[in-house]
């Protein structure tokens, strides 16, 4: 699905607000030149704590909260793309858990904000929709 999804992503980049969740997070970063790799541990139905870092423009910097994870792949780091900032990381593993591109209005979560395992998931989506 990546080739077709990447084509659609590139068509709307900078024209429409884009939110990538889980595989969408991976697909957007892949389209921006990132490598996506297998994790040592698979997280299906797993709750992890994340930390919002200083580069976030949307979320409370320094805040920790729990999120629902359902994935076996992750972003290979280091990763750098113009206007993309990794804004949340898993407290335990340090894995990238969200990004923001506030210029093109592109956002992504490696976790599932809609999951009952994610605390305040609706608030996360509302903040992106109002950005």
Place the predicted regions along the sequence by residue.
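Conserved donor sugar-nucleotide recognition element shared by glycan-biosynthetic enzymes
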Residues: 1, 43, 121
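Catalytic nucleophile loop
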Residues: 25
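Catalytic beta-strand/loop cores that center a nucleophilic Ser/Cys/Thr
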Residues: 56-103
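C-terminal and late-domain segments of enzyme folds
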Residues: 85-131
């Amino acid at each position: 699905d990546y080739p077709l999804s990447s084509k659609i992503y590139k068509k709307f980049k900078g024209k429409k607000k884009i939110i990538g969740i889980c595989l969408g997070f991976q697909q957007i970063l892949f389209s921006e030149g990132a490598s996506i790799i297998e994790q040592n541990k698979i997280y299906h139905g797993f709750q992890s704590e994340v930390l919002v870092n200083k580069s976030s423009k949307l979320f409370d910097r320094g805040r920790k909260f729990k999120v629902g994870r359902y994935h076996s792949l992750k972003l290979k780091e280091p990763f750098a793309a113009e206007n993309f900032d990794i804004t949340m990381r898993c407290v335990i593993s340090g894995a990238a858990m969200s990004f923001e591109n506030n210029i093109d209005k592109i956002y992504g979560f490696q976790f599932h904000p809609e999951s009952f395992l994610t605390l305040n998931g609706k608030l996360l989506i509302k903040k992106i929709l109002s950005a």
